[in-house]
Amino acid sequence: MTTITFRSQGSRITGFDVQGHSGYAEAGADIVCAAITSAVRLVETTVNDVLGLAASVKVRESDASISLRLPGSLGQTAESTCQALLTGMMIYFAQLHDEYPEHIEVLEDE
């Protein structure tokens, strides 16, 4: 199972942790894993490459995990954009959980 934990401070989503394999299918044929990976890469690329922010990203292949943390202080436009991206990602993963409850878990942690 893949566990996705969204981190927040108050109402601000500060980042997320994704860990584990979904186990839906074998590597290369796992549509749940592909959906998760695609969303994570889209958000990370948008935050760091398009918006030019310096979000901290850590990848550990040993336990199939990736984490992203937003910088502490962002301008109003960047903050609003990042919150919209992360909220959309949270909703998307909740919908995936509804479709594949045995393969993805979504948590929120303050």
Each predicted region: which residue ranges?
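N-terminal intrinsically disordered, cationic/polar leader segments
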Residues: 1-31, 41, 45-110
